[in-house]
Structure formats: C-alpha cells, structure tokens
Amino acid sequence: MAGQGSQKKKSCDWSKRYVDHLNGKMKCFHLQMSANFGHSMTIPNKFLDHFGGTLSRTIELVSPKGIVYIVKVTEHMNKTILQCGWEAFVDAHHIEENDSLLFRHIENSRFEVLILDSDGCEKVFTCAGIKKTSSVQERNAAPVDISRSTHDETTQSSGSKKFVRCQRASDSQRGKTAKLAETSSSGESGEEGTDSSTSEDESSYELDDPQMPPGRNYVLSRWTSLSEAQEEKVDMLVQDIQPEIPVFVAIMKHSNVNSRRACLVIPKRYASAHFPLESQTITLQRQGKNKKWYPMFYIRKDGSGYMLYGCWKNFVRDNHVKEGDMCIFHLTKFTGGEFGATVHLLRETKSGSLGSFHTSHKRFDLRDGRTWPKVTGVRRVSSRPYLTADRVSLTEEQVRKVEEVVHSIQSEGPMYVSIMNKSNVGTDGLYIIIFGRQFATRYLPEGEQTLTLLMTGKSNAWQVKMRPRSGDAQMITTGWRHFVHDNHLQIEDICLFQLMNDESKLTMTVHIIRRNEKS
C-alpha cells in the first residue's frame, strides 16, 4: 500500500511541476489508467469547465513519437468519453493498467500526450518498436500480430514535418514474424486471425499486390476481378470524379464486414505509394455527407501488411455495408491537412439484369445505368412525341404529367424522358444520366461532346460532358452533379430533356416534374 502511495505521489508531483510552467492557465490533466481503460477514457469535468463544459466532436492526440491520432468524443451518462480511436492509441503505445497519461492542450482540439509507467517515469519508445504482450493482442482490433524484429520505420513529426528514419538491422538480427491465421485468396485475414505461432513463411499480405486493368484509372486487390456490369459502374464513377491518382476498388468479403474483427487490407504497393508512411488514424467520409469516421491505418512492422481496422467496423455498421458491396476509395486531404478518403459505396442487388457479381447469383441492376424503383399500374406508351430509356415503363399518372408538359411546350425538337433514380442523383455515389440507344443514335452526335443544359425560368447554364457508352447509348457524367445539386433533384423526379435545334452548340432545356407535384 505504501508503495502504491509513493507511486501516485511521484506522478502528482511531476504533474504539478509541469503545470506550474503554463502561466497559471489550465492546459493539462493527468489520469492513471485503471481497469477497463483500453476501450474508453473519461475526461475530468473540472478540465472540461475550461472549455465551457464541452469539447469538439473529435480531438487529436499527438503521441510521443509525433504521430497524430484522431479520437471521437462522445457523451454518456453526463460524462465526456474518448472512445472511437482511443483503443488504437492504447494499443500502439502498449499502455497498461497503472500507467499514467499527462494530456497537454496545445491548440483547438489538439493534445500532446506524455506516457508514464507505473513508477511515474516516462516511457521510452524506440524506433524498433516494442514487443506486444498477449494482453494487448487480446484487445487489439487488428487480426495480426506485430513482428518482433527491428526494421525500417519512418516517422513524420506532425509539428516540424521532418522525417526520422531508423537504421536498418541486419537480417540476422530479425526475429521471426508472427504467422497469420488462415487467410482468404485475396490476402485478407480470416474472422479470428489470432494464431500467434511463428513461421519463416511470407505472409499473404506480401502477396496482396494491386492490379490495374489496362486503360483504367483504378486499382483492384490481387485475385479480384469485376464483371462487365461492375466495370461499367466503376468506369462511370471514375469518369465523374476525375481522380488525380487511381482509386482503390474493394469488393467486400466476410472478413471486411461480418467478422468480429472486421478489417480491410490495402494492397501493399498502392498503400506504400499513396497512404501515410506511418500507422495512424485516417479519416473516411461518404460523398455528400458530413459525418466522418476514423479507422486506424495500420502498417505491419515488417512492412508486409497494410490495413484499416478499429473504427472501420463503425463505418461498416453506420453505412450498412454488406458482403458483395463495392467500396471505392478516392484519396484526398480534408480541412486541416488530415489524410483521408472519400468512399463511394456501390450496392450489390439481387435483380437479374446485368453482370454476374462475384461467385454468387446476384446481379447489379443497371437497366441502362439505372436502378429503377418498382411501379404499379404500369403500361408502356406506344405512340408518343418523346422517347424514354430502353425497358423503362411509366405509370399512368407519370404519363399524364409528362404529356401535359410536352403539350404545353409544343416543341419541334425531340424530347427525352428520364425518371431520376439513385445513380442519377448521387444516392449510391454516382451522378450520371444515360440517353438510351434509340434517342442517342437518332438525335445525338457521335463521340465525346460538351452539352449545355438550360432550365426554364433560370438564367443559369450548366456545361456537362457527354460520352459514348456501350450499346450506342450516350452518358452525361462530369458537370451533372452540379446540375443535380443546383436544382435539388430527388429520386423519382422526372426530367424532360428538350433538344434545342436553333442553338449554335449542342443544347438541351430541362423541364422538371417533381415527384410530389400534382397534376
């Protein structure tokens, strides 16, 4: 008991001296790690009063090695808790019960963290890293063990932006790496992945090199192939977002979404070229949504494996990601310079239209690039002064609304009718419009074109790109997103595209019939 009291006294005395240098302002708080600290941590209310009782929704923890971890702040039973991202910080620094942490507020929502052992002495972190104990392995969200060897490791200081590189140890000094549990053919870990036996064999992570299909601006994991329908979906998205570097396309497997330790392996060459050089928290965001997720990007100590884990499970859960869905990672940097990716989620459906999906009997429901809502009381219009997409039917109510608009316009030029769906308005990550073969071959010029869109009653003009598509159809991609947002288009709205014959350049006037608009 006396020993424990002296340990606490050391920590408190050290903390007091540290705070005395801060000009009388409360910038620090000190906590000793008690039981169950590994999953969450409560911030003292007295310290929170300095911030008016609240913190921002996320904070940044700067480790002794200069690595920045983004941790989510939540409220529970009148307590402010660090949760999502905290476990990754604990695991990375091998924090144990009775260790002490001193948090120093730097600016905004950023804190420097000093880690003290149970004796009140600062923990020293070498470049070679520290062997993990079994207790850490049990709570670690990653389904792999860390290599026990010295190795090349590059750290980047978040303050000075300087790089520190460790000396490479000779091969004879390297320990044996921990063997992974049985992995899938794409090199991703299985559901449990906790086998800690050692082996000289190369990990399957080292074989998980990316594939870039010829002429495509995206990367696939090794052993992954896309059906024609999937390729078409990805091509449409890539043409729309115009990425500076290839996007990463991952088809979700059981280990990515359903495993207790769900994670996502990033191909080695792709990750080493485009992801951070150090294990750290990164930011994921969905297109058009404000919410962010902060999974841990983890680099295996021998450099053979790269993965997302930890709060990756939260991303999967919150976005209802299922096995067979496609996640397309568009790498970018968000406000403040934090590294992250915008994730475009393309769902797998069970409709029997186009393209086999993986090894199951499921299909992507494209229907000329669309996922059409089910309608009742359907009849196909035969003789009409407008055209629709192939295989598209209108309800009697929709026909009546369309014909009222067509009659009021009295257009001499041809008209094309399109019912907005997920792929048209960005709900599934795409912003495209397909002009069906019959309309495209009869009225539209061949090859890639710039098309001007006008709106009745508005002076704005939108420039969009129109590109050829298989089957003699034409597709609007780049620029269509702005038209959708500016005109607040929603699913089941109807757009009538009126081709203007008296314009010097290719132009269409768009007439919108809102879903809830009454005749």
Curated annotation (Swiss-Prot):
Residues 189-209 have a biased composition (Acidic residues). GO terms for molecular function: DNA binding. CDD domains: B3_DNA. PROSITE patterns: B3. Residues 26-119, 249-349, 416-516 bind DNA. It comes from the Eukaryota. GO terms for cellular component: nucleus. InterPro entries: B3_DNA-bd, DNA-bd_pseudobarrel_sf, REM16-like. Pfam families: B3 (PF02362). It is found in: Nucleus. Keywords: DNA-binding, Nucleus, Repeat, Transcription, Transcription regulation. This is B3 domain-containing protein Os03g0620400.
